Amino acid sequence: MSLQISPIPAHPQGECFLTAAEGRVILPASIPVDTIGRRIQVEWDPDAPVTPLGQLVFFCQFLAAGGLYSKWVAECPLRYTSPNAPKIRDVLGTWVLGCLSGAWRYAHVTALRGDKVNPQGLGMEKVVSEDSLRRAFQNEDRVALACWQKEALLRTYAPALEQPWIADLDVTVKPIYGHQEGADIGYNPHKPGRPSHAYHTVFLRTLRVALDVDVRSGKEHAAMHGLSNLWSLWDRLTPGQRPWVVCGDAGYGNERLMSECEARVQKYLFRQRSTTKVGQLVKLLEQRGGWQPLLDGWEGNEGLLQLTGWTCKRRTIVLRRKRPESAVGLEKLPLLTGQEVELVSGPVYEYVVLVTSLEENLLSLMHLYRQRADVENAYDELKNQWGWGGFTTRDLGRCQVAACMVAQVYNWWNLFVRCAEPSRAREALTSRPLLLHAVGRVIKSGGQTKLIITSNHAEAREVQDILSKLSLFLSGLTNAAEQLKSEERWRRIWHRILEPFHQQATALLGGSG
């Protein structure tokens, strides 16, 4: 007769709390937690109307006053046929909340689904799931989506184009770790051999506003691949809205772009790489002399340059400065980083060569080029603080949609911060804890809804003053001036943003902020 051996569970049950029917664990109402120095009773309240983004209500007021958000939602070409599909307003609102909270993957929006306060401020019913957000634009027409997003971006920055401004061109590389469309091996200085996407972007200088972005495969990182998007943007603008000058780094100083600028009577300022003929020009200027002292030890001279393949000679500016005695000094150069400095001739000086169609003096041209450093800061903020290049999917089309989504929310938030405190600019790393993060608790009584905000920021008093003044300004636009259309209200918001720029005629050509 065989022995009957009873199975022994691998994990002893111990003490547990079970319901009689389902056999589910019953969690205790409170848990004693022994911390350093004292015991604390912990309770959960998953249904409490609270939010960690309590000050988002002021951003919602900002969007409502400008009328941009409602029009953005109304014109969205996204269409659902299933009765169980999420609402378009919920999908777009989840995008806004996700970007503002610092998400860079679709899975990150799951952390927002318990927020029962902020979705109401954006006219939402709920925060949608990550799968709904990921699949939202999967089967939509790419042309219709591009037109919708480009028009929304244009409405955001259009009032700023009524005065002279500078368009900065740049491209950044985003490493890809999956098998996405367009993930090709191209130029990738930080991770050589790693597939990537290339983001070709046009920025509005000084205000750090992203005008447009074009996502390309990793092999299409050269400047020429972003020209079609540049001229598409340029053609959408009226003659009075077009940039005063287009600026770019060494990759943009080529015959194709410069000849197209000249055909459109568009002024430009581009840096040149070190080539044989560039070196010959520098040697010629060294022999001729006549260097003018400029700023921070830099001197300038100019001549005419025609490289092989160029159709004509062009004005070329050469800037030089004595090389530091050590590499440490080189890293501290205020004009260009060590990677951007190119030695063209001789061991004594370092040189920067610019080609331009402008007629301004050498000091003005040097100042214009130095301001390009702000574009690098904007790229750094978008990639590291806004998750630009995140929200990656297998198809390149949705990566393009995600890049424009992030750019749109980035613009709105930056302008909100500027409107709240026009005298200074803040990156998201400091502006979110200051103007967004705070515990918000909703109390409903007597038919009214009250939001009680508690901020743990050291400058909470100053923040309360800043946001209160902003709210009064926005309320004045919507209440005291009800006859104003949304476009005029948005124009007045821009007027407040540009107040710190003392010379309005040249506000966006440099200066404050």
Predicted regions and their residues:
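Short amphipathic alpha-helical "interface-anchor" segments enriched in bulky aromatics
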Residues: 62, 109, 362-405, 409-413
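Short, conserved catalytic/metal-binding motifs centered on acidic residues
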Residues: 62, 94-95, 109, 129, ...
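Flexible loop/turn segments at secondary-structure boundaries
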Residues: 116-119, 174-176, 209, 219-220, ...
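Short secondary-structure boundary/capping segments
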Residues: 181-186, 260-266, 283-289
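Basic, amphipathic alpha-helical segments enriched in Lys/Arg and hydrophobic/aromatic residues
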Residues: 389-453
